[in-house]
C-alpha cells in the first residue's frame, strides 16, 4: 500500500510539473511572412484554426507562413513520408492574430482537415485519385476545376466542402454528422 501511495505521489508531481513546463505565448499583433523550401509531398494534414491555401504546381514545393512575428519560432513545418504537417510546437499558443499558410506541390493525393481549419485549393487540381477528409468545424473549398480519375470526399461533424467544378470518372461522398458537400457543376460517373 505504501508503494502505491509513493508511486501515485510521484505520478501526480510529474503531471503537475509537466503542465508548468510548457511555455504560454500570445501573438504580438505584428504579422510577418516567412517562406521556405520543403521536400516534395502529396498529402497534407491540417488541424486547428488555420487558413491553408494550396496550389498544384510543377514548381519546387514551398511553404509560406504568415503569423505573429513572435510566434514564428514555434511554427513546426514537417514533411515525413510525403505528408506535410504544420502546427505550433514547443509552446502553448494562447492567442494569435492570424495563421495563414500558402503552399504548393506537384500533386495532391490526400488532405485531412480538422478543427476550425479553412482549407482552400486555389488552382486546378489533376491526378488519378484524391481523398479529402474534413471533420469538426472545418471548411474545404476546391475553387478551380478538379479533374481526377476518382474523388473521395468524407465529411464528419459540422465540416463543409464546396467543389466549384468537377470532372471525374468516379466520385464517392460520405457525410456523417451535420456537415455538407456541395458540388456546383461538373460531371462524374
PLM feature segments, named:
Residues 1-189:
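Intrinsically disordered, low-complexity terminal regions
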Amino acid at each position: 500500500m505504501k508503494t502505491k501511495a509513493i508511486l501515485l505521489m510521484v505520478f501526480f508531481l510529474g503531471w503537475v510539473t509537466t503542465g508548468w513546463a510548457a511555455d504560454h505565448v500570445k501573438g504580438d499583433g505584428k504579422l510577418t511572412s516567412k517562406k521556405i523550401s520543403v521536400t516534395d509531398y502529396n498529402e497534407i494534414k491540417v488541424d486547428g484554426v488555420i487558413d491553408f491555401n494550396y496550389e498544384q504546381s510543377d514548381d519546387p514545393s514551398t511553404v509560406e507562413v504568415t503569423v505573429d512575428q513572435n510566434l514564428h519560432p514555434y511554427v513546426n513545418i514537417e514533411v515525413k513520408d510525403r505528408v506535410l504537417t504544420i502546427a505550433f510546437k514547443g509552446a502553448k499558443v494562447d492567442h494569435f492574430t492570424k495563421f495563414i499558410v500558402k503552399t504548393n506541390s506537384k500533386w495532391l493525393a490526400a488532405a485531412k482537415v480538422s478543427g476550425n481549419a479553412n482549407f482552400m485549393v486555389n488552382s486546378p487540381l489533376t491526378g488519378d485519385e484524391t481523398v479529402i477528409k474534413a471533420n469538426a468545424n472545418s471548411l474545404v473549398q476546391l475553387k478551380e476545376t478538379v479533374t481526377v480519375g476518382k474523388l473521395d470526399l468524407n465529411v464528419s461533424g459540422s465540416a463543409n466542402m464546396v467543389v466549384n467544378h468537377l470532372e471525374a470518372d468516379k466520385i464517392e461522398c460520405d457525410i456523417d454528422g451535420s456537415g455538407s458537400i456541395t458540388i456546383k457543376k461538373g460531371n462524374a460517373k
